[in-house]
Amino acid sequence: MNTIHVDVVSAEESIFTGQARFVALPGEVGELGIYPRHAPLITRIKPGSVRIEMADGSEEFVFVAGGLLEVQPHCVTVLSDTAIRGKDLDDEKANAAKAAAEEALKNAKSDLDLAKAQSELAVMAAQIAALRKFRQKK
């Protein structure tokens, strides 16, 4: 069976390393699906869920808050400032952070404050969506 080596790395640690049959994640211009022997590619990724289909058919989920993707024919590397394993996502923390971002959006006094709040809100909305996807697959 053909597999591809996958590394998902955050600023703090390696989140996932292993062999996979397929990887799906949110690219900047749409959803990306990567199989072994994919053409080389470097692109930015949006906040969302990385779905890794293992060789045995099981799935692993990782939330990334955006980042970079490098694809080589036999290797996929996902680099993100923030990456959280699906099983480690916390509903309460995500909802509290989303509420804080919404409040910051209302109280933004400058364009920079507004942009930061919008970015944080988008990341938290993506994290909550990733959490829902992960719970559906359980």
Swiss-Prot record:
Task of the protein: Produces ATP from ADP in the presence of a proton gradient across the membrane.
The keyword Coiled coil belongs to this UniProt entry's keyword annotation: no
Matching HAMAP family: ATP_synth_epsil_bac
Keywords: ATP synthesis, Cell inner membrane, Cell membrane, CF(1), Hydrogen ion transport, Ion transport, Membrane, Transport
Intracellular or extracellular location(s): Cell inner membrane
Primary localisation category: membrane
Species of origin: Verminephrobacter eiseniae (strain EF01-2)
Subunit structure: F-type ATPases have 2 components, CF(1) - the catalytic core - and CF(0) - the membrane proton channel. CF(1) has five subunits: alpha(3), beta(3), gamma(1), delta(1), epsilon(1). CF(0) has three main subunits: a, b and c.
Pfam families listed in its UniProt record: ATP-synt_DE (PF00401), ATP-synt_DE_N (PF02823)
Source organism superkingdom: Bacteria
Mode of membrane association: Peripheral membrane protein
Protein name, per record: ATP synthase epsilon chain
Family to which the UniProt record says this protein belongs: Belongs to the ATPase epsilon chain family.
